From Swiss-Prot:
Reaction(s) catalysed (UniProt annotation): tRNA(Asx) + L-aspartate + ATP = L-aspartyl-tRNA(Asx) + AMP + diphosphate
Site label Important for tRNA non-discrimination, positions: H38, G90
Cross-referenced SUPFAM superfamilies: Class II aaRS and biotin synthetases, GAD domain-like, Nucleic acid-binding proteins
Stored PROSITE patterns: AA_TRNA_LIGASE_II (PS50862)
Protein name, as recorded: Aspartate--tRNA(Asp/Asn) ligase
Record GO terms (molecular function): aspartate-tRNA ligase activity; aspartate-tRNA(Asn) ligase activity; ATP binding; catalytic activity, acting on a protein; nucleic acid binding; transferase activity
Lineage: Bacteria, Bacillati, Bacillota, Clostridia, Eubacteriales
């Protein structure tokens, strides 16, 4: 029989009980982790979000409670009244925080029964992730999942406390806004009362937080929900959370210093990490040159080395032609990997090809010098210079790519990370934060034949570069910055444009004419005419930051109800079909249904 809690009020959480509670009568509530019969006694491990405690039922002391306990099964929901006592000598469980005590149950109420779960509710069980997502309410009962969400809560609280102490106001911005160009595709929401018109869910609160600066709010933050209808790459979510920050009357150093303080405090309070400050800074160009990435993992070496000057006059045409055509020749030193087999090197070549490298040249360094099919094309002086540049020693494997700078960076940067993981060069439990600064404002899209904003079109150019917007847009430098942790971008921001004339020049440079700018961003441009202060800010990816600090492998493990890589919710089966009547109210017809009807009619 299902019972109610009338008269029983929880006094303690299961995981709180210790030896000092011995002799105390307590009321506990929770789920049955397991039930065991031993020598006329029934032992129930009762679990709540704080932990597990053992409850003992004896027929000699409380027969009614004992009889109920016989009917209990895993995941039943119980309320128990009993007395805390030290466990008998030799029966303590060192694996439990409550392992020195147990509760002698005198009253038991079965508040709800449970079917047999499709997987064990405990850590360390190998369960298919789709099954976990289908039964997310069961998956979230597991201690490691509950700990992850508690960790996330504490991280959010740390951020809120820090920003509140530094004069920030938490202000909510609209979830229903208008669609704007640039960036990923918007999630669109049809307006019933405005037929044929659509809202968009925000990809970020960017424009609203800038307008809050125009409004004189001075310091704003929000732990904001954002939405992007993009093709999901590994470990992305269509809806995500970011720590959104904006400040008036600041420069780059002000934003970076405040962010470092917030992140360092979060790491200390939530993860117990002492992060040194200030964070190192790398220019965008230096990051690309040394690591082949604008989000470098600096926990290990194996940096890219440029040998273009040496290779330009060599007899190996692949190298010499690449340099002559404006390309580069760069390499990495896989120290100690000179024993790699030809197949292993071929596998590395195939890996680099994924990033458009046309080939992977290699030198195996030995005591005599270099073993390579291409060494004959180099003079002794050239080989010696290459070995010195690469800091090569006998037993090393040198890997080279000759191509356009972007291909060299992408392929060697990815190969560096691949080898770093494969060779165990990346230390566990270390956290390297750094800033990447001095980005170009724009990048050229070869396919569309136009410039695009590298970050977003509201990023301020350096004042000295503003004249270049009309004459040489590719040379304009941005007041932008990215925060990188262990090779993952966890945040990005900039000083913003606060003058209408500069904003219009940037729009023109990226192919947005005055008419389109007025239609899409007229409200922002008009706001800039009413006394806009200089301002800047940053947005940190909260899901990813929590994942990295919690030591998880995927952001899905720090989000309560994540979507799959195909943007579906396996628990609710969203997205799903809607009734024709709902579509009519929204003045929408689905093309798929029309096409199906046409196909059937054509038969």
């Amino acid at each position: 029989m299902i019972e109610f809690m009338d008269g029983l009020k929880r006094s303690h959480y299961c995981g709180e009980l210790r030896v000092e509670h011995a002799g105390l009568e307590v009321v506990l509530t929770g789920w049955v982790q397991r039930r065991r019969d031993h020598g006329g006694l029934i032992f129930i491990d009762l679990r709540d979000r704080t932990g597990i405690v053992q409850v003992v039922f004896s027929p000699d002391l409380h027969e009614e409670a004992f009889l109920k306990a016989e009917a209990v099964r895993n995941e039943y929901v119980l309320a128990v009244r009993g007395t805390v006592r030290e466990r008998p000598e030799g029966t303590a469980n060192p694996n439990l925080a409550t392992g020195q005590v147990e509760v002698l149950g005198c009253e038991l109420r079965i508040l709800n029964r449970a079917k047999t779960p499709p997987f064990y509710i405990e850590d360390g069980v190998d369960v298919d992730e789709n099954l976990r997502l289908r039964y997310r309410y069961l998956d979230l009962r597991r201690p490691e999942m509950q700990e992850a969400l508690i960790f996330r809560h504490r991280a959010a609280k740390s951020v809120r406390d820090f920003l509140d102490e530094h004069g920030f106001l938490e202000i909510e911005t609209p979830m229903l806004t208008r669609s704007t160009p640039e960036g990923a595709r918007d999630y669109l929401v049809p307006s019933r009362v405005n037929p044929g018109r659509f809202y968009a869910l925000p990809q970020s609160p960017q424009l609203f937080k800038q307008i809050l600066m125009v409004a004189g709010m001075d310091r704003y933050f929000q732990i904001a929900r954002c939405f992007r209808d993009e093709d999901l790459r590994a470990d992305r979510q269509p809806e995500f959370t970011q720590i959104d920050i904006e400040m008036s009357f600041v420069d780059v150093d002000d934003v970076l210093e405040l962010t470092e303080g917030m992140v360092a405090r979060l790491c200390r309070e939530v993860a117990g990490l002492d992060i040194p400050r200030p964070f190192p800074r790398l220019s965008y160009r230096e990051a690309m040159d040394r690591f082949g990435s604008d989000k470098p993992d600096t926990r290990f070496g194996m940096e890219l080395k440029d040998i273009s000057d040496i290779a330009s006059g060599c007899g190996f045409k692949v190298f010499a032609s690449a340099v002559a055509g404006g390309g580069q020749v760069k390499g990495i030193n896989a120290a100690g990997c000179g024993s790699f087999s030809r197949k292993e090197i071929d596998d590395l070549t195939a890996f680099a090809a994924v990033y458009k490298a046309k080939g992977l040249a290699y030198f195996i360094v030995n005591e005599e010098g270099v073993k390579s099919a291409i060494s004959k094309f180099f003079t002794e002086a050239e080989l010696s210079a290459i070995l010195e540049r690469m800091d090569a020693k006998p037993g090393d494997l040198l890997l080279f790519v000759a191509d356009k700078p972007e291909v060299v960076a992408a392929s060697l940067g990815a190969l560096r990370l691949h080898l770093g993981e494969r060779l165990g060069l990346i230390p566990e439990g270390t956290y390297h934060f750094l800033w990447v600064v001095d980005f170009p404002l724009l990048e050229y899209n070869q396919e569309e034949g136009r410039y695009e904003a590298m970050h977003h079109p509201f990023t301020s150019p350096r004042e000295t570069d503003i004249p270049l917007l009309e004459s040489d847009p590719g040379r304009v430098r941005a007041k932008a910055y990215d925060l990188v942790l262990n090779g993952t971008e966890v945040g990005g921001g900039s000083i913003r444009i606060h003058r209408r004339d500069v904003q219009e020049k940037v729009f023109t440079a990226i192919g947005i004419d005055r008419e389109e700018a007025s239609e899409k961003f007229g409200f922002l441009l008009e706001a800039f005419e009413y006394g806009t202060p200089p301002h800047g800010g940053i947005a940190l990816g909260f899901d990813r930051l929590v994942m990295l600090l919690a030591g998880k492998n995927t952001i899905r493990d720090v989000i309560a109800f994540p979507k799959t890589q195909s943007a579906t919710d396996l628990m609710t089966m969203a997205p799903g079909p809607v009734a024709e009547e709902q579509l009519r109210e929204l003045h929408i017809r689905t093309v798929l249904k029309i096409r199906e009807r046409e196909r059937l009619t054509a038969r």
